[in-house]
Amino acid sequence: DFQEFITDYCWHQVWDKKHLSNKQKSFNNLCILASTNKWPEFKLHLNGAINNGCNFYELKELFLQIAVYCGVPTGVECFKHAEEFFKLSDIDINEEMS
């Protein structure tokens, strides 16, 4: 029941709205999840962000902005978790984001 509620609410009622692009929704989610230290969900939404058209350069800028507004340790965590995620995906994040 709970999973059904979450799926219906998040995906059908919120994500189906049309005023923000899915890419923008992904950026918003990454910011919110980073600022609240929800790192497992952050990594999950990294995959969604890539699927929604976010590129490495945009993510780098996003993480820098997160570092400014949420604190450098949070920005460091963003880069750390992104590096782990992309390593598992066989993408060299250091090369892509340098």
PLM features: residue spans?
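C-terminal structural segments of small proteins and small subunits
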Residues: A67-G75
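Short amphipathic alpha-helical surface patches that mediate protein-protein
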Residues: L64-A67, E83
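A generic alpha-helix surface/boundary motif
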Residues: E4-Y9, S26, F42-L44, K60
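Short, structured motif recognition centered on aromatic/hydrophobic residues
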Residues: K25-L33, F63
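Short alpha-helix boundary/capping elements
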Residues: C10, I32-K38, G71
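Mid-chain, well-packed structural core segment of small domains
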Residues: S35-K60
